[in-house]
């Protein structure tokens, strides 16, 4: 009898824990449709998810947005996430990628940015974007940093770190 009561109480506790941890708020957004202007969109903190990692975007620093030719905009909480996602796309040259610049605090075209590899980023990859060249800090071009991401040369790699 005690085993049955214990099992019922344990089951009720587990069910209560599952119900209390459910996300019953508004659904999170990882893709917005209809951005035919191909400009970066305003992000509401806590409402948008990184399309690659599934984490909530709570800060603009190190974020990125990728706009597809059809106007679909994908959001990323780490610059390396957009690069890894971009490598899997068939139409890379038609996708407009925006990265958040740490020096001017606005979105800039990813191909025009300078990059650093030693930043503190949400996913720990270490890539930071800058609008202006800062000698000794932001010394990498777009193609160089995409190649680093493709090779796994990030701060998560113990041989790089």
Give short role names for the model-derived ranges.
Residues 1-75, 79-161:
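Intrinsically disordered, low-complexity linkers and terminal regions
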